Amino acid sequence: MAILEVEHINKTFGRTEVLKDISFSLERGQVLSLIGSSGSGKTTLLRCLNFLETPDKGVIRVNDELLFDAANPVTKQESEIRKKRLHFGLVFQSFNLFPQYTALGNVMLAKELLAKSQPDYKARKKEIHAEIEAEAKRLLDQMGLSERMNNYPHQLSGGQCQRVAIARALALSPDILCFDEPTSALDPELTGEVLKVIKGLADQNTTMIIVTHEMAFARDVSDKVLFMDDGKILEQGPPEDVFENPKEERTRQFLSRYTNG
């Protein structure tokens, strides 16, 4: 059974149709890469999945649960949307860490805010805090940052900041982890360390959706690739099909820019 089902998503900004009848599915443990030129709708699609934008049409299901139906006003209530965001974790290309918190504090923050809504929070405050701190330290250690957890973002390299952002997204145990061009703000040396972390998550069967311009990485790490053009999914399939035997001329044109430099 698919962990994610997206059906006929449309999104318009003003008179510009940014997403046009987007449909795809993803199995648990799979990695999906979204590729395509800048402005093709990839980031908007991620933002719709994370409920940072509201689709004008379409349906989104996670674990066979209806999260969003544009025809059903109940699924568009802000109180419901806040809960549904927890199904997804989003790692931004520009990190978006809070500068006033350490690496550890950034990873703990969302989980602590969520814990305050628990009915037993006041009675178990110290215990809950200790549990959240231990999990945050484990995640930072997994990211290779155990010696940097008390550093502030301005004391970290771009690659380290991005790894903190990944740990922060993982802290809420999302069903699906999303990346929006996670290496676009990094130099080539730091790009490699972040891609290594993402590859490690893939090896652990973490379900992920990755917007990327790193074609070699997408080919290597993905179970499925979607090529988007002008707001539409023009081609989708296993990486060996999309990269080696694309059916659409537009896909071939796009990929030739990378293979030919």
Report each predicted region and the residues it spans.
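Catalytic Walker B motif of ABC-type/P-loop ATPase nucleotide-binding domains
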Residues: 177-180
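A short, proline-enriched helix->beta-strand linker immediately N-terminal to the Walker B motif
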Residues: 171-175
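ABC ATPase "signature
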Residues: 236-237
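Conserved ABC ATPase signature
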Residues: 152-156, 160
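Helix N-cap at the start of a conserved alpha-helix in ABC-type nucleotide-binding domains
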Residues: 188-190
